[in-house]
Amino acid sequence: MSTKLPIVISNGTAFKKVPVQLLLNSGSEAQHGLPRNADSQPARPRTGITRTCGQCGEIKTSLQWREGPNGAACLCNACGLFFRKLILRFGRAAAKRYMEQIKGTGTKRRIPKELTGTVRF
């Protein structure tokens, strides 16, 4: 079938009108309505998004990122769970202050008994 088919433009995208017979035939043309290009390169594999934790600075390609003191998903899973536990125990304002105090110090993620004064290292 070597008939010229009209091209329809819709919303800035060009589509080729294909007869129904062509879609019913078997082969590479039948699957997409257009002939396959044998010279096309295979698709590149997707790579994960690399993020840095706003608290501990850990670089991970994790699927789970949690809300932190700054709001958006800026904490790794471990720091996010720690922050949530601080909120439950001391409230959001105190938890936010504590997270700012221990940021980047290498302090273990252990819930303190109380949040008075400054953090001891």
Curated annotation (Swiss-Prot):
For whether the record's keyword set contains Zinc, the answer is: yes
State a single Gene Ontology molecular function: sequence-specific DNA binding
Q: Keywords assigned by UniProt?
A: DNA-binding, Metal-binding, Zinc, Zinc-finger
Q: Zinc finger regions typed GATA-type: which residues?
A: 53-79
Report the InterPro entries cross-referenced here: GATA_TF, Znf_GATA, Znf_NHR/GATA
Q: Does the keyword Heme apply?
A: no
The alphabetized list of GO BP terms reads: cellular response to zinc ion starvation; positive regulation of transcription by RNA polymerase II; regulation of transcription by RNA polymerase II
- Give the gene symbol: GAT4
One GO cellular component assignment for this chain's record is:
nucleus
Name the UniProt record assigns to this protein: Protein GAT4
* Matching Gene3D superfamilies: Erythroid Transcription Factor GATA-1, subunit A
Annotated region Disordered: the residues are 29-48
